[in-house]
Swiss-Prot record:
This is tRNA-2-methylthio-N(6)-dimethylallyladenosine synthase. Catalyzes the methylthiolation of N6-(dimethylallyl)adenosine (i(6)A), leading to the formation of 2-methylthio-N6-(dimethylallyl)adenosine (ms(2)i(6)A) at position 37 in tRNAs that read codons beginning with uridine. Belongs to the methylthiotransferase family. MiaB subfamily. It comes from the Bacteria.
Length: 474
């Protein structure tokens, strides 16, 4: 009888990536098949996030529901991973004894052994250690699910912003070897992936080892990925301004595969607040980066993160943030009211901003950025946009839907054979959350660049010798 696995994922794209790897890993080692119904599962996994407020309460609320399922089925195994698990460790089991497995972001590759331990000994296991990059060496080959894919290139962060838990839950920065990354992307390209999103908590700090003992910079990695035939779009998330060096900006000048859209978190427009956050840059320095980017790629759109109501934020501080929003003309943002994360330096700061004031500021900020996003969308009417077709439209299965470089959903009339390919469409109308387009040309009529086939990348990157040790084949 087939064993079923249910995974609940909260949080960032890195967590989504990790959850997909868990599913692939447990399918290969234990034969688990995914189910969307928790009641059907033999194994329940919760991949948690601790960035936002009340993360712990949210976890224990769901575990209370899963406890009832375990009372009905004592053989059910419950596992909790991610950043809350990394923070709480053994204390998590003290509040939720129904949990059998507790693992951190860096130990998900050990899940098969942990599950075996529970099944053989009927005792729980906790592993929230930081074994650096080991997990990537023990995960199964990537499996494409559509024309887009996430690829993790590094883990952790060394910046220690005062509001952030990432360095404590995911560890400090560790970069994957460049050839391992190219090997994974080439495998995905061979399966039909056309767009990759390179992931890392501080992705532009990437410094990966090469086969010959050298170091590959993030800018160099971007060019190597762009050279793989079939990979015609590259995104990356998330960046830090102090690591956004000129060599990365130069890639925007000469590498069209790198999309004209960048998510670059700034958090605040007030230098005083940025200093309290330990962001290590000023608002003016952030604007200088954007100015150079727009010189290299005039049509680039910028999105960002904002924290409203950081401890001690005055009305003047907030007005400086709003000025930055207007000056940069952000397209979209992920903006939140500040909530203290246990164990971070900012959690000890006196919070003298009222909840009502925080909510009002957040509303003003989000409303302004929404207006700017609509202005950008309206300017797209009459333009020709290259769209990667992802599938049928949500509202009309007789139509297709895809995304532009700046992440706009476009619905248009087309044929099913276009799914997974690029098309050029003329934008004719704008809606609140999508655009309407008319098909102009298909991929067969385009001149997409071809540099190196996925098969040749696979052939020249990581191989294994007779005892399973990775070797490089030039």
């Amino acid at each position: 009888m087939t064993k079923k696995l249910h995974i609940k994922t909260w949080g960032c794209q890195m967590n989504e990536y990790d959850s997909s790897k868990m599913a692939d890993l447990l399918a290969s080692t234990h034969g688990y098949q995914l189910t969307t119904i928790p009641e059907e599962a033999d194994l329940l996994l919760l991949n948690t996030c601790s960035i936002r407020e009340k993360a712990q309460e949210k976890v224990f609320s769901l575990l209370g529901q899963w406890k009832l399922l375990k009372e009905k089925n004592p053989q059910l195994i419950i596992g909790v991973g991610g950043c809350v698990a990394s923070q709480e460790g053994e204390q998590l089991r003290q509040r939720a004894p129904c949990v059998d497995v507790i693992f951190g972001p860096q130990t998900l590759h050990r899940l098969p052994e942990m599950i075996n331990h529970v099944q053989e000994t009927n005792s729980p296991v906790v592993d929230i250690s930081f074994p650096e990059i080991e997990k990537f060496d023990r995960l199964p080959e990537p499996r494409a699910e559509g024309p887009t894919a996430f690829v993790s290139i590094m883990e952790g962060c060394n910046k220690y912003c005062t509001f952030c838990v990432v360095p404590y839950t995911r560890g400090e920065e560790v970069s994957r070897p460049s050839d391992d990354i190219l090997f994974e992307i080439a495998q995905l390209a061979a399966q039909g992936v056309r767009e990759v999103n390179l992931l890392g908590q501080n992705v532009n700090a990437y410094r990966g080892a090469t086969y010959d003992g050298d170091i590959c910079s993030f800018a160099e990695l971007l060019r190597l990925v762009a050279a793989i035939d079939g990979i015609d779009r590259i995104r990356f998330t998330t960046s830090h301004p102090i690591e956004f060096t000129d060599d990365i900006i130069d890639v925007y000048r000469d590498t069209p595969e790198l999309v004209s859209f960048l998510h670059l978190p700034v958090q605040s427009g007030s230098d005083r607040i940025l200093t309290m956050m330990k962001r290590a840059h000023t608002a003016l320095e952030y604007k200088a980066i954007i100015r150079k980017l727009r010189q290299a790629r005039p049509d680039i759109q910028i999105s960002s993160d904002f924290i409203v109501g950081f401890p001690g934020e005055t009305q003047q501080d907030f007005e400086q943030t709003m000025k930055l929003v207007a000056d940069i003309h952000f397209d979209t943002s992920y903006s939140f009211i500040y909530s203290p994360r246990p164990g971070t330096p900012a959690a000890d700061l006196p919070d003298n901003v009222s909840e009502e004031e925080k909510k009002q500021r957040l509303h003003i900020l989000q409303q302004r950025i929404s207006q700017q996003a609509m202005e950008i969308s309206r300017k797209m009417v009459g333009t020709v946009q290259r769209v990667l077709v992802e599938g049928t439209s949500r509202k009309n299965v007789m139509e297709l839907a895809g995304r532009t470089e700046n992440n706009r959903v476009v619905n248009f009339e087309g044929s099913p054979d276009m799914i997974g390919k690029f098309v050029d469409v003329e934008i004719v109308n704008v809606y609140a959350s999508s655009l309407r387009g008319i098909l102009l040309r298909t991929e067969d009529q385009m001149d997409l660049r071809t540099h190196e086939s996925p098969q040749s990348v696979i052939a020249r990157t990581r191989k294994e010798n007779e005892i399973g040790v990775g070797i490089y084949q030039p």
